[in-house]
Amino acid sequence: MNELTPREIVVELDKYIIGQEQAKRMVAIAVRNRWRRQQLQEGLRDEVAPRNIIMIGPTGVGKTEIARRLAKLCHAPFIKVEATKYTEVGYVGRDVESMIRDLMEISINLVRKEEAEKVRERAEVLAEERLLDLLLPIGENRDATREKLRSLFRQGHLKDREVDIEVQEQTQPIGILNVPGMEQIGNQMKDAFSRIFPQKTHRRKMKVSAAWEHLVGEESNRLVDNDKLTDLARERVEQMGIVFIDEIDKLASASQHRSSDISREGVQRDLLPIVEGSAVNTKYGLIKTDHILFIAAGAFHLSKPSDLIPELQGRFPLRAELEALGKNEFYRILTEPDNALTRQYEALLETEGVKIVFTDDGLKEISAFAEDVNTQTENIGARRLHTIMEKILADISFDAPEKFGTTLEVTKEYVVSYLEDIRANTELSRFIL
């Protein structure tokens, strides 16, 4: 369990997300409470439930990013789902329990990577021996030749040589069951058939570098204890899992329209036992959801949280309102985060030998323009910056291979030259930006 304090969590989130202090503090406390729960005596520990959160705010203000960065920070299994993709039990489509099954698959992959890393050193030794067996010609002085090949391989001189290697055929899930809501049955049948019938293999030519990684992966899988892996993954889901339910507002309906939205209300009622705490059946066994943290999010333009059914409102006791972003926040987004868009474009074009320099007045003009377009058309928050940056850098991105060694200064004048026609024509900005 991660032992970061709430203040340390907020500091880490500040590296990637601008503003939204209330939401950051709320999720930081929720994560710290998990660590606090682990310190309690067993009887009391089981009684402490997570405080689920509803984030309220327009699109592009950081709701999803806060949850995603939080999960990475805690090395927790994380899944983002859209509430509108689920249907009430009895209708064609995915039922809400599938989000827990998907979360378990994510946890399995997460723990498998960690366990494979622990045995990688041993796996590399075994993979090297198998690779030398493939490279070694039949003849005399095999030991001496083997050591020469080992030396050449470790020095990287053999990476482009090709070898024939046996690889397992990748089987696809049974096609007839590849319809929404039937994936679980398809996967179970696939697993059953794989146990009955032997896995087919075929010979494939690979470069030594690719064969090396393939063999290391095979040996790692053999060394990892799958029963232990499943137990660790299940515990990780039950104790640290985070489910982010986006567009929860689309399930809410104002009281005057409630009679026509029976299916939406049905999905809300199906969510109740999972959020409250129940056992979901997966191919890895039962997963208890009692201590999984659920974070719901929505813009709530046409509805409000109180339009959700009362029982579901009670399962999300914490509310965080995220503020709409203006030009000041856009400027900070372009300059402060470690992964700022400006740094991304600088790095991308530097691979072609083109240097981009963003001036302060250029960045302020981009920020002001993003605010104007969001005000006049749809407010899509920080995502507007992506479309504007693509527009003003489209020419240099196209011509970069012929511009090796040049420097481009993105000034206010440069930005205006690309955007003034769009600014003057509101209808044009609706289509282009």
UniProtKB/Swiss-Prot annotation:
GO terms for molecular function: ATP binding; ATP hydrolysis activity; peptidase activity; proteasome-activating activity. InterPro entries: AAA+_ATPase, ATP-dep_Clp_protease_ClpX, ATPase_AAA_core, Clp_ATPase_C, HslU, P-loop_NTPase. It is found in: Cytoplasm. ATP binds at I18, G60, V61, G62, K63, T64, E65, D246, E311, R383. One of its GO terms (cellular component) is HslUV protease complex. Keywords: ATP-binding, Chaperone, Cytoplasm, Nucleotide-binding. GO terms for biological process: protein unfolding; proteolysis involved in protein catabolic process. SMART domains: AAA, ClpB_D2-small. Pfam families: AAA (PF00004), AAA_2 (PF07724). A double ring-shaped homohexamer of HslV is capped on each side by a ring-shaped HslU homohexamer. The assembly of the HslU/HslV complex is dependent on binding of ATP. PANTHER family: ATP-DEPENDENT CLP PROTEASE ATP-BINDING SUBUNIT CLPX-LIKE, MITOCHONDRIAL-RELATED, ATP-DEPENDENT PROTEASE ATPASE SUBUNIT HSLU. Belongs to the ClpX chaperone family. HslU subfamily. ATPase subunit of a proteasome-like degradation complex; this subunit has chaperone activity. The binding of ATP and its subsequent hydrolysis by HslU are essential for unfolding of protein substrates subsequently hydrolyzed by HslV. HslU recognizes the N-terminal part of its protein substrates and unfolds these before they are guided to HslV for hydrolysis. This is ATP-dependent protease ATPase subunit HslU. It comes from Lawsonia intracellularis (strain PHE/MN1-00). The lineage of its organism: Bacteria, Pseudomonadati, Thermodesulfobacteriota, Desulfovibrionia, Desulfovibrionales.
